[in-house]
């Protein structure tokens, strides 16, 4: 009985701490720990986001690809820069 009570208290403490950490505004919502080396077809790309937080281990571009998947890429790679330009052009032509 004492072990289960102690475990329950520990679980509640951890969950309360996790909620505070996740709600903290200074912590980025996403970080890339690895980047892909594969070039992604531009037709599969939906959008991108630049991750530059000092709390993340590296700067990266996160591409949202079809169907609803996120891929991290190295912003220094030429294909990544070309993909960003492609998405920027598409978003400009679709805006009224």
From Swiss-Prot:
The family database entries (Pfam families) matched by this protein are listed as: IL8 (PF00048)
Which Cys pairs are S-S linked? 31-56, 32-72
Q: Which residues constitute the signal peptide according to the record?
A: 1-23
**InterPro entries recorded:** Chemokine_b/g/d, Chemokine_CC_CS, Chemokine_IL8-like_dom, Interleukin_8-like_sf
* Tissue expression per record: Lung.
Q: What are the protein's UniProt keywords?
A: Chemotaxis, Cytokine, Disulfide bond, Glycoprotein, Inflammatory response, Secreted, Signal
- Where do the record's glycosylation annotations fall on this chain? 93
Q: Which GO terms describe its cellular component?
A: extracellular space
Gene3D superfamilies noted in UniProt:
2.40.50.40
UniProt-annotated location(s): Secreted
Q: What is its main location?
A: secreted
Keyword Secreted found: yes
GO BP, one annotated term = positive regulation of endothelial cell proliferation
The terms under GO molecular function for this entry are: CCR3 chemokine receptor binding; chemokine activity; protein dimerization activity
Purpose:
In response to the presence of allergens, this protein directly promotes the accumulation of eosinophils (a prominent feature of allergic inflammatory reactions), but not lymphocytes, macrophages or neutrophils. Binds to CCR3.
Q: Spell out the family assignment given in the record's similarity comment.
A: Belongs to the intercrine beta (chemokine CC) family.
Record's PANTHER family?
Answer: C-C MOTIF CHEMOKINE 13, SMALL INDUCIBLE CYTOKINE A
**What protein does this entry describe?**
Eotaxin
Q: Which organism is it from?
A: Cavia porcellus
């Amino acid at each position: 009985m004492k072990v289960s009570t102690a475990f329950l208290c520990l679980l509640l403490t951890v969950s309360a701490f996790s909620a505070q950490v996740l709600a903290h505004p200074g912590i980025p919502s996403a970080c890339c720990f690895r980047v892909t080396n594969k070039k992604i077809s531009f037709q599969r790309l939906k959008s991108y986001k630049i991750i530059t937080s000092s709390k993340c281990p590296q700067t990266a571009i996160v591409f949202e690809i079809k169907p609803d998947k996120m891929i991290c890429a190295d912003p220094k790679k030429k294909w990544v820069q070309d993909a960003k330009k492609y998405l920027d052009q598409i978003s400009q032509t679709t805006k009224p």
